[in-house]
Swiss-Prot record:
Belongs to the RSE1 family. It is found in: Nucleus. InterPro entries: Beta-prop_RSE1/DDB1/CPSF1_1st, Cleavage/polyA-sp_fac_asu_C, RSE1/DDB1/CFT1/CPSF1, WD40/YVTN_repeat-like_dom_sf, WD40_repeat_dom_sf. This is Pre-mRNA-splicing factor RSE1. GO terms for molecular function: nucleic acid binding. The gene is RSE1. GO terms for cellular component: spliceosomal complex. The keyword Glycoprotein does not apply. Involved in pre-mRNA splicing and cell cycle control. Associated with the spliceosome. The keyword Nucleus applies. One of its GO terms (biological process) is RNA splicing. It holds the Pfam family CPSF_A.
Length: 1269
């Protein structure tokens, strides 16, 4: 960046946070093939009742701005889709209406609308889309305490939705399913002044008038009430039916109970005559006990909670009901994670309700818990990991406490091992995320401080190559082919082309052995140029002066059927074949063409003479390829027509120039397109499409992938969604069809690019993904091919390395745009402390370790962590952690490996106090130092030595500064920090740190929260309230001079220089901004010596809905041609800013963004166009003609269907200040999540001249991910 350049940034989210705050379960997806049938059923207003029995095996989770859908029917969390929205979700519930076969999702957001969603599944692709059924306005946009948008619950019979604000307002909206469509009534409101709502629940009253129970506080008297509100369906009015004054003010929780009459429990005394209506019950949670209360006030039954001895307060925070055939039970969780099984049983004599409770198990503290009909339980954790568990027991033998003895107390002891549950699957979370370090290497690797006890997370943006077999070859091969006869399901031969010979390996019964001897008909004393398989049993081997056709006989051996030689003095350059076609390129620039019929190889008499030597050939895999792609030495790509009935058969029909000579080619069919992949000798990878009608090449894209020539290879039959635990155990299910034959739609063609770094590219979710391929110890692959055997049924591959190794393995952990990183956890444990308590443990525990693995959950403990990069060694990082004993520990990581001390410890205690801030610096020497600022106002200096990957630490000294320092930074050969209103530079002394410079700061800087420096000359100071101030270091006077400050108050959390006069930062409210010194703003009064001369102007601004914690600049991320700015959010967000450099890029994406923000308006205009009316026939009725619109059925049109919640994303991104100079790529990337018809309509509205088609728009969006991220 330069001072005069305009900053325009592209922003996208690489990993979304998982702070789940809302959830519900149901049958959400509707097959789109049955949608038309449902809409066509208009025989009656109501329509037929749904006869489908709901399984409710789908889980809907929501963060503040994203909805996720999972299927748990297979015992795992299978993701069906993610849908970010441009609003903050305040509450969420569901509706299971009688005449609707699927579940409707209901959302309340700060857009001011009540939104109803329908999930539709494509029966062909299996992809799930969202359709907005209604956006019912209930208030203005924004978050207000009087607006009913917080507590939302749905009637158990799904007739209406109750919701209330924090104060005063309560509302009810009726909903029904008629003629295959959702009908939503107008909101009905009730006002309760001076009432604050703490919690609410919808009562089960069968088909009586819906009832809502709420815990309320009278703000004037501080009295607590349990209030019951009734929606009178006859009067269409929301009424207060009854309220109970509560004496105990520790109440915090309320949940509904089932209709107890169905379980032979008396709900009214015998003398009560009104037995027809249902008397609903609720359970209220107090500090240490539960109470069962009914609406009429006849019963109030209490029972004590089993509590821990070490805690003083226990409160219920969530609960769920699970109904059995003739019974039910309630599962509740306390604020300590303890789960209780609660039951309501009838008294043996009076049949009055009796409350019983028992301790069930312990899980991490959750926002909510859900029980599925399959016997699985899911806890929705806002922090840490959420678990999908299976009931091993219902706890029938648990010790129970009943309401017969309401004063009885019981104490429990908990463990990290589950007793009645076993873990099936989990969703990990990085929330809270406070620090990270990103490497400048490829692939992008991030060390993230997730603040979880004894854990450190490494995130890698690469596909994993899992090595199974490795062997070193006697000579380094140049090429590799794996041969699978089309009639066989597994590979049988491996060909290795050496410099002067060919080696053949045979796969037999799971072993790889040398294939040689006199019976071998293949050529072994010459290097092979090409090896391939044709028709059912033919193998083609091509050398420089010979072409062989080898037939595999039925009884096993191979025999030679054809031996073809080129003309005298002419050699073969290269060749390629598919199942029926073979093309050979000769040194005299001629192209020979063969076709095989019934194992007979027939040559076409005509030959094509090229202007240049052909060094690579590609055909479509399969029976017949209509075109052949030729790569020529004159840096061109030429298309040869092979359509026998075409008038231009066997002629060049198209030519595409390249930027360098091609090295390898690949021609394949991907979904509906023909694609060409070209690896060039300059290290550039090119992909393009081929027009199937005339053979022309279009949609050309290039990417630099390495410093060596690029070898492209195809791996077909790759299952991207495959998991290792899906494999059958040996000996089981032998009668089943092999995995790779089950579903053709499950497989995705994958292209591997081998250069100085290996890459893979594939299409997932209609988006192109290009990611590095990560191997063990960074091995560079040279050539790779598919490899399927009886032991490796899916994703297997065989490759050779640049060092002459033969690797057999499989590809795993594929990435997508919504899942950009693979996660790995490091365990940070002091081995001495760990082993001290385990010396006398029984040796048999090791045998039970695998059995208990599914019964242990991660104890959610938080420790403050900071990750630092060494100032001189980029491969070395430090992890500073707070221990459970309130000490400070250090761990070091180099090249993805934890370094250990001479004693074998990976964790070293470096201070007996808790750190507050840390900094890595060298004080102008070659020695590594860590400076720790403690809570007591000390600076502790630790020296670090790393020799032969052995970590050594040494305490140097400590310095009292008598102030709590929150931020430090290495400044040249000194340490910069802010102490008591001064900028202080420290130098290294023998006994303590020495103050080298002290500069007084302006008085408005009161508490410094962030510091950063630029090249030892500029210092940026971020204040907790007064934004950023930039200082310049005056070397002559050894002091700092104030250069610029901000006129806007910002609560700074982090700041980072991006050039000498510009900084990027974030504030505590979730905004990211770029500030630059405005040197034209010299309007300050000279007499005010403490004020800065210039001001900072805001270049960029955008609301992110996550508090930025740290920024890092990564130069040439994943070998891109420009730097990127990575940032992390407190809730676990990982985002990326990419500068848009060219004017064309800036105009293009600005046009996309402005049009995207107007889509709701454009959609409204397209659906409400005035009809053309003949003025002569109207006879002056202009007013009536003026109001005639195209869409006469206004109920079919839904406002805000494109934004999904009725709010454009630019308004959302401008929550605190207008969005400026940042392209919201995260929103533009969501195009493929819309219905196909909406995708085409959106693409047609883009204003750019070339963006009228959907694929063109997708191309521009894909370029940002594939080229720069």
């Amino acid at each position: 960046m330069t001072q005069d350049s305009e900053v325009l940034l592209w922003h996208t989210v690489l990993q979304r946070h998982r702070n789940y705050v809302h959830s519900c379960i149901g049958d959400f997806t509707l097959d789109r093939s049955s949608l038309a049938t449902a809409e066509a059923d208009t025989t009656s207003v109501k329509g037929p009742r749904s006869s489908k029995k709901r399984k409710e095996l789908q889980l809907c989770l929501a963060t503040q701005d994203c909805v996720e859908l999972y299927d748990v029917s297979n015992g795992t969390l299978d993701a069906l889709g993610k849908w970010p929205i441009a609003a903050t979700i305040l509450s969420m519930t569901k509706l299971n209406m009688d005449r609707c076969s699927h579940t409707i999702l209901v959302l309340i957001t700060d857009s001011g609308n009540l939104t109803f969603w329908q999930f539709e599944r494509d029966s062909v692709s299996g992809k799930v889309y969202v359709r907005t059924l209604a956006n019912e306005p209930i208030s203005r946009s924004g978050i207000r305490r009087f607006v009913p948008q917080y507590q939302m619950v749905s009637d158990p019979q799904s007739r209406c939705v109750f919701f209330s604000g924090i104060e005063r307002s309560k509302m009810c909206v009726l909903a029904d399913w008629q003629r295959g469509k959702l009908v939503v009534g107008s909101p009905i409101e009730i006002q309760r002044s001076d009432r604050i709502t703490l919690a609410s629940a919808a009562c089960d009253v069968s088909f009586d008038n819906p009832v809502n129970a709420a815990i309320e506080v009278e703000s004037g008297t501080n009295d607590y009430y349990l209030s019951f509100y009734t929606m009178d369906l006859g009067l269409n009015t929301l009424l207060l039916r009854k309220e109970h004054l509560l004496e105990d003010k520790s109440i915090n929780f309320v949940m509904q109970c089932p209709n107890l009459q169905q379980y032979k429990i008396k709900t009214r005394p015998n003398d009560e005559t009104d037995q027809d209506s249902v008397n609903p019950f609720v359970i209220c949670g107090y500090d240490g006990y539960l109470t069962l209360i009914d609406l009429e006030g006849f019963y109030e039954v209490s029972v004590q909670l089993p509590v821990r001895k070490t805690v003083s307060s226990t409160n219920i925070i969530n609960g769920t009901i699970h109904k059995l055939k003739k019974d039910f039970f309630i599962l509740m969780q306390s604020n300590h994670g303890d789960m209780y099984k609660v039951g309501i049983i009838p008294d043996e004599e009076t049949k009055a309700p009796v409350l019983e409770i028992a301790y069930f198990d312990t899980l991490p503290t959750s926002e909510d818990i859900h029980i599925f009909k399959s016997g699985a339980l899911f806890n929705v954790s806002e922090f840490g990991t959420s678990y999908l568990t299976q009931f091993e027991s219902l706890g029938e033998d648990l010790e129970k406490i009943t309401s017969y003895t309401p004063g009885r107390r019981s104490f429990i002891e908990t463990e990290s091992t589950l007793k009645n549950l076993s873990i099936l699957d989990s969703l990990t979370s990085l929330n809270p995320l406070t620090s990270f370090h990103a490497s400048n290497s490829t692939p992008l690797t991030i060390l993230a401080a997730a603040n979880q006890t004894e854990n450190l997370v490494k995130l890698t943006s690469a596909v994993d190559f899992e090595e199974l077999i490795s062997t070193t070859l006697p000579r380094i091969p140049s090429k590799l082919w794996t041969v699978r006869i089309p009639k066989n399901e597994t590979h049988s031969l491996i060909f290795l082309s050496m410099e002067t010979s060919t080696t053949i390996l045979k796969i037999h019964e799971g072993t790889v052995e040398d294939f040689g001897g006199d019976s071998n008909p293949f050529i072994l004393n010459k290097p092979s140029l090409f090896v391939g398989a044709m028709v059912q049993r033919s193998i083609i081997q091509v050398t420089r002066d010979c072409l062989l056709q080898i037939i595999e006989m039925h009884d096993g051996p191979y025999t030679k059927k054809l031996e073809w030689y080129p003309p005298a003095g002419v050699g073969i350059v290269t060749a390629f074949c598919n199942e029926t076609q073979l093309v050979v390129a000769l040194t005299n620039h001629e192209i020979c063409y063969f076709e095989i019929i019934e194992d007979s190889l027939n040559e076409l008499q005509d030959r094509v003479e090229m202007d240049s030597t052909v060094n690579s050939i590609a055909l479509l895999a399969g029976q017949k390829s209509g075109y052949c792609v030729l790569g020529c030495e004159d840096s061109s790509l030429q298309i040869l027509n092979l359509q026998s009935k075409h008038p231009d058969f066997f002629t060049i029909c198209a030519i595409q120039s390249l930027i360098s000579k091609p090295h390898s080619l690949l021609f394949m069919r991907d979904t509906s397109d023909l694609k060409i992949h070209v690896g060039m000798k300059s290290g550039v990878y090119l992909s393009s499409k081929l027009n199937i009608n005339d053979g022309t090449v279009f949609d050309v894209r290039t990417r630099f992938v390495g410093t060596k020539p690029v070898q492209v290879n195809l791996l077909d039959n790759i299952d991207i969604n495959h998991k290792d635990d899906d494999d059958d155990e040996p000996g089981e299910n032998d009668s089943k069809i092999d995995d790779f034959k089950k579903k053709i739609s499950d497989f995705t063609p994958l292209v591997v690019l081998n250069s100085s770094i290996s890459w893979v590219t594939y299409e997932i979710d209609d988006k192109i993904t290009l990611r590095p391929l990560k191997t063990d110890e960074g091995i560079t692959l040279k050539h790779i091919n598919a490899f399927i055997t009886d032991d490796i049924k899916r994703n297997g591959c065989c490759s050779i390395t640049s060092k002459g190794q033969l690797l057999i393995g499989k590809l795993d952990n594929f990435l997508s745009w919504s899942n950009w990183f693979n996660e790995k956890k490091y365990t940070l444990v002091n081995d001495e402390l760990k082993n001290a308590g385990n010396e006398e443990e029984d040796e048999d525990e090791d045998e039970d370790e695998d059995e208990d693995a599914s019964e242990k959950y991660e104890i959610v403990g938080y420790q403050s962590q900071r990750i630092l990069s060494d100032t001189t060694d980029n491969s070395l990082s430090y992890v500073i952690s707070k221990t459970a004993n309130k000490e400070t520990s250090l761990s070091a990581i180099r090249d993805d490996k934890l370094l250990a001390t001479n004693n074998g410890n990976t964790v070293v205690i470096i201070a007996k106090e808790v750190f507050n801030a840390v900094c890595s610096c060298n004080f102008g020497t070659n020695v590594k130092y860590i400076v720790i600022s403690t809570e007591s106002g000390k600076f502790i200096v630790i020296q670090i030595r790393v020799k032969n990957n052995v970590l050594e630490t040494q305490y140097i000294h400590e310095t009292m500064v008598h102030s709590k320092v929150n931020a430090m930074v290495s400044f040249g050969d000194k340490l910069a920090c802010c102490i008591l209103g001064n900028v202080v530079l420290f130098g290294l002394g023998k006994k303590q740190l020495l103050r080298k410079s002290i500069t007084e700061m302006p008085p408005y800087i009161t508490q410094v929260t962030a510091l950063d420096q630029w090249d030892g000359t500029m210092l940026a100071v971020g204040d907790i309230r007064e934004s950023v101030t930039i200082f310049k270091y005056d070397i002559d006077n050894n002091s700092f001079i104030g250069v610029a400050d901000d006129i806007v108050k910002r609560h700074v959390t982090t700041v980072k220089f991006i050039d000498v006069s510009s900084v990027i930062g974030g504030d505590r409210f979730g905004n990211c901004w770029v500030l630059r010194v405005n040197y034209e703003s010299d309007t300050r009064v000279a007499s005010n010596i403490k004020a800065c001369q210039y001001t900072l102007e805001t270049l960029c601004h955008m609301y992110m809905n996550d508090t930025p914690m740290k920024f890092e600049i990564v130069n040439h991320m994943n070998m891109s041609d420009r730097p990127a700015i990575l940032w992390i959010g407190l809730q676990g967000t990982i985002g990326c800013f990419v500068p848009l450099i060219t004017r064309k890029e800036q105009q293009l994406y600005q046009s996309f963004q402005s049009t995207y923000a107007e889509l709701d308006v454009l959609h409204f205009q397209d659906n409400n166009k005035p009809e053309e009316v003949d003025l002569e026939e109207t006879e002056g009725a202009l007013d009536e003609a003026y109001h005639t619109t195209k869409n006469t059925d206004h109920q079919d049109y839904v406002e805000g269907v494109i934004s999904r919640v009725g709010r454009d994303f630019l308004s959302y991104r401008s929550s605190y200040a207008p969005s400026k100079n940042i392209i919201d790529g995260e929103t533009l990337e969501q195009l493929t999540t819309y219905l196909p018809s909406d995708q085409r309509w959106i693409a047609s509205k883009m204003k750019h001249a070339d963006s009228g088609k959907l694929d063109i728009f997708n191309k521009y969006i894909n370029e940002m991910r594939t080229n720069y991220v």
